[in-house]
Amino acid sequence: MVRLFVYGSFCKGDNDHDRLDDSTLLCTQARIMATLFKSHACDAYVKLTQTGTVYGELHEVGDHIMEQLDEYNGAAGAVYERNSVTVHTDHESCGAVVYTGGEEMEDGEALPHGNWKLDRYPEGNDMFYFAYGSCMDLERIRKAGVEALFEDVVGGASLAHFRLRFSHHVHDGGRADIEEDHLSSVEGVLYKVTPPAVDYLYDREGVYEGHYRPTIVEVMSQGRTYLALTFTVINKREDKVPPFHYAKEIYRGAFPYVSTRYKNQLQELFTISFPVQGMSTYMKELELHR
């Protein structure tokens, strides 16, 4: 078996993913040190570097699939080349194979966030945003004068194979993050949004300061699957207890939309795992006045 890093049309849900039907998906938020390009000659290609970051998926594939991919990608010619690379996930670093642009690949346009799915999103007219932290709550959104951008709420949504963390540190405590965990799920609120809402979110999440990065995830809401924009911490640290005002935003925003099971998880989170002073009383009061 071979570990394979894919970043373009071979990713789950894209045009060539069926060529990996017999593979095992190990990680959807894997990364390598490289620069991602798109060109007229092909959908996407990477050049290995020591500065950039490209995000994609890590698969485990059989030798027969690799033989087929070699033929398809023209690895023996000059279109794509098979290379060895170190892949980083939220839990480990490992060696893998990646197909990079060959020497004769024409110069393309570098993609700023190193994420093929993000560059192509949305492929249709509808754009969705999955909030799992403080953006489930509208208080700060109202104060910013952008409430109209978040009025179209699809409903509660669930992100499978991730867990909630507080790995971004600021002066008064931790801030919410998601991390891949095949035994867990994260619930939140799914909004239908427009580009001005995305601009607000990029600023609020500190994308340009390098705090969070945008990514595309698959969520379930009311029995339907959606591809949605969300944000995850780039430099994850150990979990840190969030402050009361932030924990309150999360619970208040989640309360009308998430399942009873997840509500109970949040209650346990803010009273036992990450005890936040005042949250036990606040959550009881919110329950009484619902």
Kindly give the residue locations of the regions a language model identified.
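Glycine-aromatic micro-motifs
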Residues: M1-R290
